[in-house]
Curated annotation (Swiss-Prot):
Keywords: Cell inner membrane, Cell membrane, Membrane, Transmembrane, Transmembrane helix, Transport. It comes from the Bacteria. This is Putative 2-aminoethylphosphonate transport system permease protein PhnV. Residues 65-253 form the ABC transmembrane type-1 domain. Coiled coil: none annotated.
Length: 265
């Protein structure tokens, strides 16, 4: 095959590098330069300043950061709890039954987030479960959107745990609850932490559904960035974008490091 030849590997490396630079590095570099610019009327900024980052860490922008972290952690932890429960429950069924029941969790990931937001807005704007104008409606939307990815990660980890380990514990007289607490969950913990990292990053960057349903006082960072750029305040929006990217990456790196450490035990 071409990819196994030295020229093929070199060509693949060049293509991958070009795609990375064009579609990831350059846009991020432009956003960073914009966040530091005093004025940008030509090819390059005419001056640099940190005032946009100062604005991003004060007032409404700071509140948006706290709101994003609160919503992200709450929705991700609840999605993790439900994902673990669902993965453990589905393991009792056959392969075909697992496949069809898993689609219940995977379905929201196939629906545009705007459609999810609209559906939740209509469903919970009246009646006994009215949540419109509250934090709960945002948490519900984020949970629906990230639950599929959490369930997928946990299911993958659970599939890699040998059934023989639990069978040995059972043969030694361990109860189902003891096996779950002292055997299954400790072995599953690295995938649970990885699932938490993925769902948290997805929640932190969610815009489509949130912009339709967020209540006053719970503006998230993506919504704040959208509002700033929509008003033409590109530099402050760029600074807030860099803050969002940096915090999300730091959280993911920390959680993945924890997951790796747990996997080595």
């Amino acid at each position: 095959m071409l990819i196994w030849s030295p020229k093929g590997r070199a060509a693949a490396g060049v293509v991958a590098s070009v795609l990375f630079i064009v579609f990831f590095f350059l846009p991020l570099a432009v956003i960073l330069m914009s966040s530091l610019s005093q004025q940008w009327n030509g090819i390059l900024p005419s001056g640099f300043t940190l005032n946009h980052f100062v604005n991003a860490l004060h007032g409404a922008a700071w509140d948006a950061l706290l709101a994003s972290l609160t919503i992200g952690f709450c929705a991700s932890l609840f999605a993790l709890l439900c994902g673990v429960w669902a993965a453990l429950a589905l393991r009792q069924y056959g392969v075909k039954t697992q496949k069809w029941l898993s689609m219940v969790f995977y379905l929201p990931s196939a629906i545009p987030s705007v459609s999810v937001g609209l559906g939740i807005l209509v469903a919970f704007s009246q009646g006994p479960l009215q949540m419109n104008g509250t934090l709960w409606i945002v948490l519900t939307a984020h949970f629906v959107l990230i639950s599929a990815f959490t369930f997928s990660n946990v299911s993958t980890g659970l599939a890699r745990i040998s059934a023989d380990i639990e069978n040995v514990a059972s043969s030694l007289g361990a109860s189902p609850w003891y096996r779950l607490r002292h055997v299954t969950l400790p072995l599953l913990m690295p995938w649970m932490v990885s699932a938490l990292a993925l769902s948290l990053s997805l929640s932190m960057g969610e815009l489509g559904a949130t912009v339709m349903i967020y209540p006053p006082g719970w503006t998230t960072l993506p919504v704040a960035i959208f509002s700033l750029t929509d008003r033409g305040n590109i530099a402050d929006g760029a600074a807030l974008t860099i803050v969002l990217v940096a915090i999300t990456l730091l959280l993911m790196m920390k959680l993945e490091r924890i997951a790796k450490r747990l996997g080595q035990k």
